[in-house]
Amino acid sequence: MGHKVHPTGIRLGIAKDWNSKWYASKADFAAYLAADLKVREMLRKKLAQAGISKILIERPAKTARVTIHTARPGVVIGKRGEDIEKLRKEVSEMMGVPAHINVTEVRKPELDAQLVAESIAQQLERRIMFRRAMKRSVGNAMRLGALGIKVNVAGRLNGAEIARSEWYREGRVPLHTLRADIDYGFAEASTTYGIIGIKVWIYKGEVFDFSQVGQEKQDDSPRNDRNDRGDRGDRPSRPAREAR
C-alpha cells in the first residue's frame, strides 16, 4: 500500500500534520475548504519565484492566520513590508475575516521535497539534461543529512517521441513504514515537447511518540560491559573448584 497512496495522507496524525487547522459545522465546511484552496492557489501564483514549500491556514475565533513557509522570505515581504500587506488585504477579502500572514524561512531547501521538485522543474525548462538535474538534487540532499531520497520524472524526456518515466534513488525510502518522516513533493515542467512530471520523496528519519521514546531510553541504559568482551556483557560467575 505504501506505493499506492499519497505519502502524506496516509501519515496524517502519525508522522505528519494537517495543512489546515479549523473546526466548522456541516453548513460551513465546504465554504471554508473552497476558500482555503483558492487562497493557496492565489498565493502560489503570485509568489511563484519565492520558493513556497507549504502554506498553513488556521481559523481561530473569527480570524484567519496564514503561515507561509518559503526559502526566500525577502521576496514575500517586499520592501518595507509593502508586498505582504497587499497579500494580507487580498487574503482577508477572499476569506471574509481579518487575516494575519506569518512568514517562516526554510533553512535547508535542499531537504524540502516540494522545493527540490520545483528546482528540478526549473532546470528542465532551461533545457538541462534530466539525469544531471536528478543526480545533482539527490547529491545535495544526501550531503545535507537526508537518510534517503527518490526522484521520479515522467514525460517526453529529452524530447523523445514516446513518453517514459525514469527514477533515481539513493539511501532508503521506506514507504511502508508509517512512522517514517517522508516528505513528498510534486511539480510540473512545461517544456516545448510537453509537460514533464516530477515526484520527490525524501526520508528524514522516524517519528516516535513520547511513550516509545521513553521505552527506548530505558532500553539504551548503560550496561556493566567489559571493554575486552565488547557487547557480550558480564558472564555469571562459576563456583570455585575444591582443592584436591
UniProtKB/Swiss-Prot annotation:
Span of domain KH type-2: 39-107
Annotated stretches, region: Disordered: 213-244
A single Gene Ontology CC term: cytosolic small ribosomal subunit
Entry annotated with the keyword NAD: no
Superkingdom assignment: Bacteria
Cystine crosslinks: none
GO BP of this protein: translation
Entry keyword Ribosomal protein: yes
GO molecular function: mRNA binding; rRNA binding; structural constituent of ribosome
Leader sequence residues: none
InterPro entries referenced in this protein's UniProt entry, alphabetically: KH_dom, KH_dom-like_a/b, KH_dom_type_2, KH_sf_prok-type, Ribosomal_S3_C_sf, Ribosomal_uS3_bac-typ, Ribosomal_uS3_C, Ribosomal_uS3_CS
Compositionally biased tracts (Basic and acidic residues): 216-244
Keywords: Ribonucleoprotein, Ribosomal protein, RNA-binding, rRNA-binding
Family note: Belongs to the universal ribosomal protein uS3 family.
PANTHER family with a match to the protein in the record: 30S/40S RIBOSOMAL PROTEIN S3, SMALL RIBOSOMAL SUBUNIT PROTEIN US3C
Alphabetized NCBIfam families for the sequence: rpsC_bact
Assembly and interaction partners: Part of the 30S ribosomal subunit. Forms a tight complex with proteins S10 and S14.
Task performed by this protein: Binds the lower part of the 30S subunit head. Binds mRNA in the 70S ribosome, positioning it for translation.
Name assigned to this protein: Small ribosomal subunit protein uS3
Organism of provenance: Xanthomonas campestris pv. campestris (strain ATCC 33913 / DSM 3586 / NCPPB 528 / LMG 568 / P 25)
Gene: rpsC
